[in-house]
Amino acid sequence: MAHRLPTRWDIKWEEELLKLWEKEGRFKTKISGSRPVFVIDTPPPYLSSNRPHIGQTASYAHFDMIARFLRMRGVDVIFPFYLDRNGLPIEVQVEKKYGVVAHEIPREKFIKMCKEELDSYEGEFVSSLRRWGLSFDYWPNGTDSPEYRRMTQKTFIELWHKGLVYEAERPTPWCPRCRTALAEPEIEYREEETYLNYIKFKVKETGEDIIIATTRPELLPATVAVIFHPDDSRYTRLNGMHAVVPPEGQVVPILPHKAANPNFGSGLVMISTFGDTRDLMIVNELKLPIRIIIDEGGRIKTGKYAGVSIREARAKIIEDLKNAGLLVKQERLVHNVPVCWRCKTPLEIIVTRELFIKQIEFKEKLIELAGKMEFKPPEYRQVLIDWIKSLELDWPVSRRRYYATEIPIWWCAKPNGERVPLLPKGGEYYVPWRDEPPPEVKEACKDGRLEGDTRVFDTWFDSSISWMYASGVTKDFNAFSKVYPHSIMRPQGYDIIRTWLYYSLLRAYLLYGDVPFRYVRINGMGLDEKGEAMHKSKGNVIDLLAPVEKYGADPVRFWAAAAGRLGTDYRYNENVIREGKEFLTKVWNISRFVLSFPEPQQKPQLAPVDRALLARLYDVAKKVITAYSEFDVYEPAHALYNFIWHEFADHYIELVKSRAYNREGVFTEEEQRAAIWTLYTAWRYSLKLLAPIMPFVTDKIWREAYGRSIHDEMIEDPPEEWKEGDQALFHLVKKINSAVWRYKNRRGMSLADRLDAVLYVSELAMQAAKDLKYMHKVSDVRPGRGAEQIDDEGLVWLG
C-alpha cells in the first residue's frame, strides 16, 4: 500500500522523537552477548558553564554519528557521556566567581562550593547536547564521583607496588596563583613584551666589567653561574674565573657551555635557580648549587627584597641597578613566557616535594607503542611521537589543591623520625586528609603516628584512564576484557595530544604493557565564522541551541559533518546549515514521492537505466561505508548530499517519473514496477546511509512507512549484483538531461514544455530512449546525429 507523508517536515517532531527514543531505551548501553562490542572513549568535557559552545558540540555530534553507524552494522556500542569535574578548572572558576582563595577557607567548605557549582551546570549541559540527538548513555557519575575516584586510586596503588612511583624533592614548574606543581604538558606559552636588560657584572679576578643581558633581573639573587659558548673567542679567557653578581654580590663561576647563544644579548648568560628548564638542565648537568629565592606564593623569600612579589622585585632591582650605574641599557623584546594552562599566571620553577610517575626511562617503548595505534588521520601520530621525544622530566602527579582525587597515602611518623608511606589495599575510595585510615594501614603503623596525605592528583591522572571507565570496569556490563585494546576508539582534539592522549598511553603501558586503545580519531577545532577560536572573553561564543531552534537539529548536524575534513579545523557556517535544511526538505519530498506508490513485493525485470542507477549507488555506498568505518563523517555527508539530491532526485527520479506514474499507459506494467521497485530500493538504502548524520528526519519517515525505527535497521554492504549495471549509461543520461535543460532554458522554455524535435543520442543512451522521450517531451529519441548539437561533447543532438 502507498503511504502519505505530511506535506512538510515539522521541527516539533524532533522533540517528540527524543521523548520516544528515551522511552524506547535507546540511550542506554545494551550488551547482547552475541554481537561484537565497540567502545567510544568519549572525551569527558570540563564543566565550566551550563552549555558547551557549538564548535565543541559539533565534535560530539561526530562521535554520535559513528556510534549510530556502528549500531546499524550490528555492533553493540558503549558510548558513554560523563563530565570531567576534577581539578583546577572548577577551582579557579569558583575562586573568581565568589572572590575566595581556596587555601584561605576551610577545605570542606571550598569542596562543597565546587560541587554545588558543578551541579548547577550539569543538567542543562547534558540536556542541551541531547537536543542535538546525541545518543550517548549519560553516566551521572563523573570523574569526581566515588566510583571514578576509587578506580583512579586503585590504579595508583598498582603503580606504587610496581615501583613506578616515587617521592622526591626537586625543581618543578609551579603556578604561584594556584599554588601547585604542574607537569610539562600543562605549561602554555604566551607572547609578552618586556625589556632585555644589559647589566654590569664584575670579574672577581681582574676587576673588569662584563655585560650580561637578561629579561629576569629579579633572579639575579638566585644566579649560580655565568656561561659562554665554548667557541665564543670574546670570553674563552674568562674560563675558570668568577663573576660578582649585583646587587647582592654573590660570587659565581664563569663556565663554557653550548647552551649559550653568542648572538643573543652580549653572549654571556646568567644561570639562575630557576629561570627556565634550560637553567634546570644546566644546574643538574654541572652540579651547581641551588639558591631558591621565590616561595610558593610567588614572593621573594630571602635577602634585601624578601616579602615583595616577583613583579615588585623586578622593578626594585632595576631601580637599584640604575642608581648604582650597573644598568647599561634596555631593549624592548617580545618573548614567550610559560604560563599556567588554567589561570594563565606566569610560572616559576621552585623546589617542592612531589610524587612522580616514571616516564623518561620508557620513552623508546612509548614511541614504539605509538606506532601500534591506528591514527585517523595518520599524520597526527608524529605529533605524539615528537612530544614523547621532547620530554625531559618524570611526571609530577601530586597537586596541592582540593577538588580532585585524593592521593591514597598515609604517612607513618616513627619515633626515630622516619616518615614511612603506607597505602591501603585498594578497592575503596579513600580521603586520607579527612578519614580514619583503614585497618591494614593502622596495623602497619602500631609504633608511629599516622597522618593522611593532603595532596591530590593531577586531573590528567584521572582522565588518562577514561578508556577503562568507558569500557565499563565499574559497571554491571563490564566489557573491558572483551574490548581491550582492540575495540576501543579514542576521539579527541589535536590540542590535547600531549596531555590526554600521551598520558593515556603512558598509563596503559605502565598498567598493562600495551596501548590503551587501537584507534585514535583526531578532530580539529570548532571555530567561529571568521576562523577564530571561540572564547567568552572575545564574545564570539555561538550558543549550540540557537541554530537548532531556528533550523532544527538535523540541518545543524549536517553542518557539523560537512564543515571540515577529519583532522582539520571547521568553521561555523550558517549557510551550510541552510543547505542542510534544504537537503532535509529534499529528502522529505523524495520520500513523499516514493511512498505515494505501493511498494512492489517482488523484484521485476529491471531496465538498463535502473541497473545503472544501482551500479552508481553501489559505488556511493562503498565509499560511504568505508568512510564511516574509518570514523570519517565528512565524506559520507558530501557523498550522500550529492547522490541523493543531484543524482537520484535530479536525474533518476525525473527520468522515471513518467514510467512510475504511467498515466498514459505507454509503459508496460513490468516496466512501471521496475521503476517503482528501483525507486524504493535506492530510497531505502540511501535513507539508512543518511540516518547516522540526520537521525530525526530519517526515523520519522521510516516510522511512517514501516512502523518501526530506522535505527534498528541494518546497513548491509550493497549487493554485489548491483555492480552489474552500467554506470556509464547513468552518467551519460545525466549529460543528456543537462544538455536538454540548458537548451530549454536558453529559449525561455519551461522544462515541462514539449519540444517539437527528435533527440539524437548514442547507442548506449538508446537503452534509456523511452524514459528520455517522455521525460523531455520530445517527438522521439533516435541514435546518431541530428542537425543541431546542443552539448559540448557532441553527445546530444536535435533534429
Swiss-Prot record:
It comes from the Archaea. Keywords: Aminoacyl-tRNA synthetase, ATP-binding, Cytoplasm, Ligase, Nucleotide-binding, Protein biosynthesis. It catalyses: tRNA(Val) + L-valine + ATP = L-valyl-tRNA(Val) + AMP + diphosphate. The keyword Ligase applies. InterPro entries: aa-tRNA-synth_Ia, Anticodon_Ia_Val, M/V/L/I-tRNA-synth_anticd-bd, Rossmann-like_a/b/a_fold, tRNAsynth_Ia_anticodon-bd, Val/Leu/Ile-tRNA-synth_edit, Valyl-tRNA_ligase. GO terms for biological process: valyl-tRNA aminoacylation. Gene3D superfamilies: HUPs, Isoleucyl-tRNA Synthetase, Domain 1. GO terms for cellular component: cytosol. Its EC number is 6.1.1.9. Pfam families: Anticodon_1, tRNA-synt_1. ATP binds at K536. GO terms for molecular function: aminoacyl-tRNA deacylase activity; ATP binding; valine-tRNA ligase activity. It is found in: Cytoplasm. ValRS has two distinct active sites: one for aminoacylation and one for editing. The misactivated threonine is translocated from the active site to the editing site. Belongs to the class-I aminoacyl-tRNA synthetase family. ValS type 2 subfamily. Catalyzes the attachment of valine to tRNA(Val). As ValRS can inadvertently accommodate and process structurally similar amino acids such as threonine, to avoid such errors, it has a 'posttransfer' editing activity that hydrolyzes mischarged Thr-tRNA(Val) in a tRNA-dependent manner. PANTHER family: VALINE--TRNA LIGASE, CHLOROPLASTIC_MITOCHONDRIAL 2, VALYL-TRNA SYNTHETASES. This is Valine--tRNA ligase. It comes from Pyrobaculum aerophilum (strain ATCC 51768 / DSM 7523 / JCM 9630 / CIP 104966 / NBRC 100827 / IM2).
